[in-house]
Amino acid sequence: MKKIGLFGGTFDPIHNGHLHIARAFADEIGLDAVVFLPAGGPYHKDAASASAADRLAMVELATAEDARFAVSDCDIVREGATYTFDTVQIFRQQFPSAQLWWLMGSDSLMKLHTWKKWQMLVRETNIAVAMRQGDSLHQTPRELHAWLGKSLQDGSVRILSAPMHNVSSTEIRRNLASQGVSDGIPPAAARYIREHGLYEK
């Protein structure tokens, strides 16, 4: 059975922390592919934010060297609000017999019970969780306790041993705006940023 991982995010810009956790996701779950899903709308209020087309281009460039990585624009081309459940449904229709895995940070796990159709979502996809520094499963809201306990036991939720890297896209954008450079960006994406004058003041 094919295993497909789904990794949504703003990727504004994509950075080495994203690639690190995507590789850990693929390795630990044994995925055939990890599909990066750049979000559509303008999620940042500051002006130094890249367009959906630029973010998509940067993700495509940054992921090109790993054959397991793919990129989808499905969250960009959909009009209006995009919800994880709807995104997963698109992939379920495309790959009806595949085992789907959704990657989320532990901060998202703590709020999962507030997501649209979350109980239907977790029936359609397995969940891989990357723990952020300082987070613990003991902090999980009681609304999720029964589901999480059962899912950890049956393997439909996996906690990755690799933690979420403490890299901030906000800080990267700030450094690019003030200094024109920032550590932690894949070289191909950094070149694109320079060539297109992204994140300048």
UniProtKB/Swiss-Prot annotation:
Which Pfam families does the protein's record reference?
A: CTP_transf_like
Q: What class of enzyme is it?
A: transferase
EC assignment: 2.7.7.18
A Gene Ontology MF term for this entry? Answer: ATP binding
Q: Which InterPro entries does the annotation name?
A: Cyt_trans-like, NadD/NMNAT, Rossmann-like_a/b/a_fold
Keywords from UniProt, A to Z, are: ATP-binding, NAD, Nucleotide-binding, Nucleotidyltransferase, Pyridine nucleotide biosynthesis, Transferase
Q: Which domain of life is it from?
A: Bacteria
* Catalytic reaction annotation: nicotinate beta-D-ribonucleotide + ATP + H(+) = deamido-NAD(+) + diphosphate
The answer on whether this UniProt entry bears the keyword Coiled coil reads no
Q: In which pathway does it act?
A: Cofactor biosynthesis; NAD(+) biosynthesis; deamido-NAD(+) from nicotinate D-ribonucleotide: step 1/1
| One GO BP annotation of this record | NAD biosynthetic process
- Job description of the protein: Catalyzes the reversible adenylation of nicotinate mononucleotide (NaMN) to nicotinic acid adenine dinucleotide (NaAD).
Q: Which family does it belong to?
A: Belongs to the NadD family.
Question: Which HAMAP family would you find in this protein's record?
Answer: NaMN_adenylyltr
Q: By what name is this protein known?
A: Probable nicotinate-nucleotide adenylyltransferase
Q: Which organism is it from?
A: Neisseria meningitidis serogroup C / serotype 2a (strain ATCC 700532 / DSM 15464 / FAM18)
Gene that encodes it:
nadD
